[in-house]
């Protein structure tokens, strides 16, 4: 009985200790180890308010650290500046200035960060900071100087990888990450960086593979969930992407983030995008790109042009974005200066050492040749990437088809163009080219069928029928030429050329009949009221 009572008392004591431990507030170090920086700030501010900071040291220094890791770089900068001005700074002035310079770098104040860092004694950390700042300021000479001072240690290799990434040298960045992993395999956060590199390279399956490795250690990471949804979206799995995003909707802090608003808009087929995307330009990196794409899809080329007109591109994707907006707008208003800029921007990307052998670089070079009417060269570049899976496969196929058509490769051009007839990017221009190719492939009846689906009494339809009339006449299909000219008489009453075409087609057809050839008139496809 005594033993039982002692056991019961002991168990009750352990339960009370366990309950007390549950109710005990964790130390700020525990919060930091969990990367719960908000929790750490709360504890630190409480300790500071109760003047119980003996075990903490300088609470403000830790609060600045937590703010920095929360992305609150301005708050961190203010604290470091205040600490430097205080009577008894917790660190020497050089260290505090270095921390201030790092905050400036993250705030985009590259010039200020560089100016401050160059006044400090050289250290590996200051060298990495200056290496980054010079990269962003495009100071190549200084960049090389700081590059030579990088050591073969993990921190410097990570800095080098970051600069490679910013310059879209994703393969080189991956090589740096692999080197670091060989030395420090426990750095699972590198898997996230590698996943992002593969995403940028368009290898979405490989990106998912590294994301899974990362999420084994950080399942609740917003960044990884966002990237995972993006890989699904790029693979055309819209529903899966939206489902992943919806899992985060219960968190009010996440729902309010610009990146969440942007991606939800993107995954819901750009519903209300015209209202959601403009305020996000300059905040979310892809917002400008998607807004320009939206305007181009809607045929609002002037709006697309205005979005990028004052924007200075820094990386290849930004150059091609601005080039596309300029190309569409320049062709619409027939402005050669705008078109020349588009051609030059495409050439810059296509001829660069970093991009010349990538899908982006080859498409850019093809576009540059396309704008100058050098379709043979454009076709050669497009052919080299024809079998590689691409994000905008329809747009690629339409452009490739036109290049093939312009170089008289009728059969191949026709096959590829017909495969994307249902695309939202299939325009009246493509329909007209399809009609031309069908006639050249001796399928005039099918070319005539295009008129059935065309918008009646529009300028595009008149152009289509003119092409059909002229191509049929050139191909000796005089009955179709006559019928097309007859329809043009109804559509374009102001022109007398169509009557002449009817006369010529009828005379030519009668001559063929006289020679014994049987001519079958085309079916009536449209009667004006």
Curated annotation (Swiss-Prot):
Gene3D superfamilies in the record: Tetratricopeptide repeat domain
Cross-referenced InterPro entries: TPR-like_helical_dom_sf, TPR_rpt, TTC26
Database matches in SMART domains: TPR
GO cellular component: 9+2 motile cilium; axoneme; ciliary basal body; ciliary base; ciliary pocket collar; ciliary tip; intraciliary transport particle B
GO molecular-function terms, A-Z: intraciliary transport particle B binding
Origin superkingdom: Eukaryota
Organism: Giardia intestinalis (strain ATCC 50803 / WB clone C6)
Biological process terms in GO annotation: intraciliary anterograde transport; intraciliary transport involved in cilium assembly
Full protein name: Intraflagellar transport protein 56
Role noted for this protein: Component of the intraflagellar transport complex B (IFT-B) involved in flagellar assembly.
């Amino acid at each position: 009985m005594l033993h039982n009572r002692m056991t019961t008392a002991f168990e009750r004591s352990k339960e009370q200790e366990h309950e007390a431990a549950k109710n005990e507030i964790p130390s700020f170090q525990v919060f930091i180890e969990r990367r719960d920086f908000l929790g750490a700030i709360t504890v630190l501010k409480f300790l500071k308010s109760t003047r119980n900071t003996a075990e903490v040291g300088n609470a403000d220094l830790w609060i600045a650290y937590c703010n920095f890791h929360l992305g609150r770089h301005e708050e961190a900068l203010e604290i470091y500046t205040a600490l430097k001005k205080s009577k008894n700074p917790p660190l020497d002035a050089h260290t505090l200035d270095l921390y201030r310079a790092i905050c400036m770098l993250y705030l985009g104040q590259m010039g200020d960060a560089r100016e401050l860092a160059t006044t400090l004694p050289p250290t590996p950390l200051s060298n990495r900071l200056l290496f980054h700042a010079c990269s962003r300021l495009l100071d190549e000479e200084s960049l090389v100087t700081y590059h030579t001072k990088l050591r073969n240690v993990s921190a410097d290799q990570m800095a080098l990888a970051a600069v490679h990434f910013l310059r879209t040298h994703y393969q080189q960045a991956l090589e740096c990450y692999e080197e670091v992993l060989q030395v420090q395999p426990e750095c699972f956060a590198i898997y996230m960086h590698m996943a992002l590199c593969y995403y940028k390279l368009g290898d979405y399956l490989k990106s998912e593979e590294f994301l899974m490795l990362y999420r084994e250690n950080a399942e609740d990471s917003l960044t990884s969930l966002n990237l995972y949804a993006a890989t699904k979206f790029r693979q055309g799995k819209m529903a899966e992407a939206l489902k992943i995003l919806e899992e985060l909707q219960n968190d009010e802090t996440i729902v309010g983030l610009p990146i969440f608003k942007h991606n939800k808009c993107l995954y819901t087929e750009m519903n209300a995008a015209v209202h959601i995307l403009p305020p996000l330009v300059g905040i979310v990196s892809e917002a400008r790109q998607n807004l320009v794409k939206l305007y181009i899809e809607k045929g609002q080329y002037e709006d697309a042009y205005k979005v990028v007109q004052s924007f200075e591109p820094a990386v290849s994707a930004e150059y091609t974005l601005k080039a596309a907006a300029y190309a569409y707008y320049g062709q619409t208003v027939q402005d050669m200066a705008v078109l020349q800029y588009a051609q030059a921007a495409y050439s810059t990307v296509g001829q660069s050492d970093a991009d010349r052998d990538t899908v982006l670089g080859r498409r850019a070079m093809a576009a540059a040749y396309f704008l100058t009417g050098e379709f043979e060269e454009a076709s050669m570049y497009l052919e080299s990437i024809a079998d590689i899976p691409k994000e905008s496969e329809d747009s690629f196929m339409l452009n490739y088809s036109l290049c093939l058509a312009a170089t008289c490769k009728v059969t191949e051009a026709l096959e590829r163009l017909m495969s994307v007839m249902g695309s939202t990017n299939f325009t009246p221009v493509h329909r007209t080219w399809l009609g031309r190719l069908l006639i050249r492939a001796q399928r005039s009846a099918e070319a005539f069928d295009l008129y059935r689906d065309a918008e009646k009494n529009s300028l595009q339809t008149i152009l289509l029928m003119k092409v059909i009339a002229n191509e049929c006449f050139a191909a000796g299909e005089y009955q179709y030429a006559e019928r097309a000219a007859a329809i043009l008489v109804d559509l374009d009453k102001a022109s007398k050329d169509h009557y002449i075409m009817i006369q010529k087609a009828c005379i030519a057809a009668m001559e063929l009949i006289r020679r014994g050839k049987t001519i079958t008139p085309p079916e009536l496809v449209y009667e004006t009221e």
